[in-house]
Amino acid sequence: MILLVDADSLIFASCYKKRENPEDDKYYRNIEDAQAKFDEQFMSIVNKLEDMYPVERVITFSGSKGNFRKLITSDYKANRKKQELPPLLNEMHQYVKDQYDSVWGYGIETDDMVARYWYELSNELGRDNVMIVSID
């Protein structure tokens, strides 16, 4: 089994810490804390899947930039509210690119990149041998 992991949402979530009190900071400010949270969650997912399937390879995807759909229509994702981004988000994307050798591209969203790899690999190896892992 080949796992194709869309890590963007996991990266985003790893920037947030559990707050004990409402006034506590919601973000990690120390990159090592965010990295540890990502690593723990990522490996938990992979380990659970390895318990169920014979995983041969894990390909991680994250941090793609731009989107061809925005060139086609300016309304693409226009209904989304502007949201404050976690301060360590860019550093975390770079960490995952470096540490997990993640696949990314320009002009395409990460989930589209995952779908393209799934299509190519499932045609080559069979649909039962390739799994997309994503929370979005």
Task: Outline where the language-model segments fall.
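Noncatalytic, basic helical substrate-engagement surface that gates or grips nucleic-acid strands
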Residues: 2-128
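Conserved RecA-like ASCE P-loop NTPase motor core of nucleic-acid helicases/translocases
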Residues: 130-136
